Amino acid sequence: MAGKDWEIVQEKAFTAWVNSVLDKRGEKISDVGKDLSDGVKLIFFLELISSKKFNKKYDFEPKARINMIQNVALALKFLDEELKIKVQGIGSEDFVDNNKKMILGFLWTLYRKYRIAVISEGDKSSEEGLLLWCKNTTTGYDGVNITSFTKSFRDGLAFLALSHKFEPESFKFQEFEAMDPIARLNAAFDFAEKGLGVPKLLEAEEVMRGTTDERSLVLYTSLFFHAYRAKEEKARLESSKNEMANRLAGLENSLESEKVSREQLIKQKDQLNSLLASLESEGAEREKRLRELEAKLDETLKNLELEKLARMELEARLAKTEKDRAILELKLAEAIDEKSKLEQQIEATRIRGAAEAQGLGLLRKNLDTHVHDLLKWQKLTMENSSSSSIDDQIIVEVSGLPFGEQVKHLATKLEAENLAIMKLLNQKEDDLKAQKLKSSKSKK
């Protein structure tokens, strides 16, 4: 069997197996290469086949690739640490990237663990136990002697015997003994599918030629084993149900022949009815409770996820608030620094103004003194002038001016007066010289 044909066989078988497990949670898949890629249904599947709870938090509706990889990684870690199953060579990316070959190998490992390793017959288990079970089940059928998976099923008689063993009324085995192997194989596959619900996974021509992969034969025959076990379990339940019904009918028929109190008979009937109803509803009630618990768990997990998102949003807001506060504190520090600089500038301006005012006052005092000195000179040198009128005139001239203009005006006035004094002194010296000269001439 070519590698591609083996993949097709596995895909059909594993899709049916995974769906039979996921049905307990109301889930299903259509493509094992794609529908397990986000890790959610993979986690459901591992929980159900192992009957162990997956306690890690994971993303129920992953959208981004990284979230899918994280989900699958958690599932593989659960498989390794909790279920103690080592699966070599497969990683999270193989599921996310839909690596069908690796995924089928992964499912084959789980199938061997949970569907083949549990098979036991006599002192044999797993594949050997399955082969022995096939041999014991077909004992007594003409032409059937099962010793290996690769050789004993090629003529179709072994598969036909397995189908006939549990559905003997559906066909007569002897009618197919004279057919060619391919016809027998196709007939056996059809009877198995219709009577036992075993899907048709193999090609009759390949089985007849002996090119079918041994794993495919092991996988296909294991479906017969589990179909028989399921049918036997169903038969046991039916037998128990019929036994209870017969006991109930027997009690009802004995009402007339036996002297049993009406109350006791009613009590026994109610007990049997209750027991019968309990047997009939046990499976449904268990499934109902499981679904309710799973629904509550899903709701709790969703609420936890919402709380997580709300907490993350609150933390983001808090971080933004802290950032804004830091910015405000920085601006406040800058404002305080600017205020300090302005206060220093104001103080420097005040000190400089006070110094300038003190200097201007001293200058004005000196100018006033100088003006009075000038007035005294004027009184000495100007015969027809009045000191009070000159003083008043200067005061009138500067009284309406600003302080700076007053200083400037007084300085100009002072300079002019100095020039006039110098001129007057020169004139007086000339007059004295002339008088002395005249006096000396008169003496001669």
UniProtKB/Swiss-Prot annotation:
> Where found, per UniProt?
Cytoplasm, Cytoskeleton
Which ranges of the sequence are coiled-coil?
Answer: 227-352, 410-434
Entry keyword Repeat: yes
The entry lists its GO molecular-function terms as:
actin filament binding; alpha-catenin binding; identical protein binding; phosphatidylinositol-4,5-bisphosphate binding; protein kinase regulator activity
Q: Which CDD domains match?
A: CH_CTX_rpt1 (cd21225), CH_CTX_rpt2 (cd21226)
* Annotated segments matching region Actin-binding: 1-227
Q: Which UniProt keywords apply?
A: Actin-binding, Coiled coil, Cytoplasm, Cytoskeleton, Repeat
The organism's superkingdom is given as Eukaryota
Cellular component, GO, one term: actomyosin contractile ring
List the Gene3D superfamilies.
1.20.5.340, Calponin-like domain (1.10.418.10)
Q: Where is the Calponin-homology (CH) domain?
A: 8-115, 124-229
Instruction: Return the SUPFAM superfamilies for the record.
Output: Calponin-homology domain, CH-domain, Coiled-coil dimerization domain from cortexillin I
Pfam families in alphabetical order: CH, Cortex-I_coil
Q: Which GO terms describe its biological process?
A: actin crosslink formation; actin cytoskeleton organization; actin filament bundle assembly; actomyosin contractile ring contraction; adenylate cyclase-activating G protein-coupled cAMP receptor signaling pathway; aggregation involved in sorocarp development; bleb assembly; cell morphogenesis
| Xref: InterPro entries | Actinin_actin-bd_CS, CH_dom, CH_dom_sf, Cortexillin-I_coiled-coil
Name the family the entry cites.
Answer: Belongs to the cortexillin family.
Q: How does it assemble?
A: Homodimer; parallel.
Q: What does this protein do?
A: Actin-bundling protein. When linked to F-actin the actin filaments form preferentially anti-parallel bundles that associate into meshworks. Plays a major role in cytokinesis. Negatively regulates cortical localization of rapgap1.
Q: What is this protein called?
A: Cortexillin-1
What lineage is this protein's organism placed in?
Answer: Eukaryota, Amoebozoa, Evosea, Eumycetozoa, Dictyostelia
